[in-house]
């Protein structure tokens, strides 16, 4: 009996040993956990691993793109010296950014430089963050600094208002002032009582000649008998005393309408018209709030230009280069036109006295003629 038990136990032990050995060889990877290499060839494994790594990289790229797309979009605005409250380019540029914020959801940061020397630093500060889909620089005197900074940050989009630089990442926004000036000339030609109208320019350069050419053509289109006096030029942008002297001389010569495109020098010309009680026309922005003798201003719709550039940047269609906007693009006009009234009333908190109906109708006719191509406005750049 004892021998039988011993034999049985020995048999069981042998079976266990044999079973364990068989299990080890049949399931060699149960401990540790099996890997992909245990079931496929080395070449297949390497291929699968490469495909897996590529998929992970694509996923990471997609996640980064989603984060970029969902990140709030912002614009940087570098105002001209003088800051907000200038009732000029700064205020209307700010209005364009505010319109983009309200309509497109694009927020904006802005700075108010105190001196031209600060432009380059502010441009670089904005560009180096990489946070802005567009950086907008207001006024011609930012051009020199921008040509430097734009070259340093070729992937950053910039827009420059009222001047041209040649960097490929800068949209240079200019305005066909001759077209808006044509409408001013129509008004002067229709409303003159003496039959003579005058013009005071800042400098005798093509830019300012462009204003005069449109003004003269508009006056003669509306009134073939009108005499448009030869233009006079201050020779400076910030000499209102000289501007006033030149305008006073024109008035003494019988001109009862003064159109001024002379920067701060032009304020003196408008003051002379006010003191002498003759019609006056402002420029760039609606300056009609200055004096009751103001009967219109040639307007550069910087707000529209700024808004369009922000929209292009937002949807990925921004392109650097030269942009010229006129009446067709709604970049220039005259502030007595009904479509412009709400903007100027909001900015300047005053309401115009309406133009006489026959004058307004003639201005609208001229505007429509320019739009249709029936009227070709001469330019000072010829």
Regions found by a protein language model. Name each.
Residues 1-69:
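Secretory targeting signatures
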Residues 42-53, 57-382:
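A residue-level marker of the well-folded mature domains of exported/periplasmic proteins
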């Amino acid at each position: 009996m004892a021998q039988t038990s011993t034999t049985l136990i020995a048999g069981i032990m042998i079976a266990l040993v044999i079973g364990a050995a068989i299990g080890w060889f049949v399931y060699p990877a149960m401990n540790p956990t099996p890997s992909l290499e245990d079931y496929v060839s080395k070449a297949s494994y390497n291929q699968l691993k490469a495909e897996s790594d590529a998929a992970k990289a694509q996923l990471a790229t997609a996640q980064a793109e989603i984060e970029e797309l969902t990140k709030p979009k912002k614009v940087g605005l570098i105002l001209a010296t003088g800051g907000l409250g200038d009732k000029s380019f700064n205020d209307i540029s700010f209005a364009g950014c505010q319109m983009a914020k309200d309509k497109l959801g694009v927020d904006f940061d802005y700075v108010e430089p105190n001196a031209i020397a600060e432009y380059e630093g502010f441009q670089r500060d904005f560009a180096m963050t990489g946070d802005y889909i567009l950086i907008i620089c207001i006024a011609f005197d930012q051009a020199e600094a921008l040509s430097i900074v734009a070259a340093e940050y070729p992937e950053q989009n910039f827009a420059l208002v009222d001047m041209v630089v040649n960097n490929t990442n800068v949209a240079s926004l200019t305005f066909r002032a001759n077209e808006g000036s044509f409408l001013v000339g129509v008004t002067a030609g229709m409303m003159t009582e003496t039959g003579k109208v005058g013009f005071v320019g800042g400098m005798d350069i093509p830019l300012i000649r462009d204003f005069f050419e449109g003004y003269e053509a508009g006056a003669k289109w509306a009134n073939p008998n009108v005499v448009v006096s030869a233009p006079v030029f201050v020779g400076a942008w910030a000499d209102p005393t000289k501007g006033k002297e030149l305008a006073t001389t024109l008035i003494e010569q019988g001109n009862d309408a003064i159109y001024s495109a002379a920067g701060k020098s032009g304020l003196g010309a408008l003051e002379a018209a006010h003191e002498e009680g003759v019609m006056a026309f402002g420029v760039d922005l609606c300056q009609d709030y200055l004096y009751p003798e103001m009967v219109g201003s040639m307007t550069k719709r910087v707000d529209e230009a700024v808004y369009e550039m922000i929209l292009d940047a937002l949807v990925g269609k921004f392109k650097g280069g030269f942009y010229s906007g006129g009446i067709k693009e709604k970049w220039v006009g005259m502030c007595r036109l009904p479509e412009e009234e709400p903007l100027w009333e909001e900015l300047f908190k005053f309401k115009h006295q309406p133009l006489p109906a026959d004058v307004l109708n003639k201005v609208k006719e001229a505007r429509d003629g320019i739009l249709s191509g029936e009227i070709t406005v001469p330019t000072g750049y010829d």
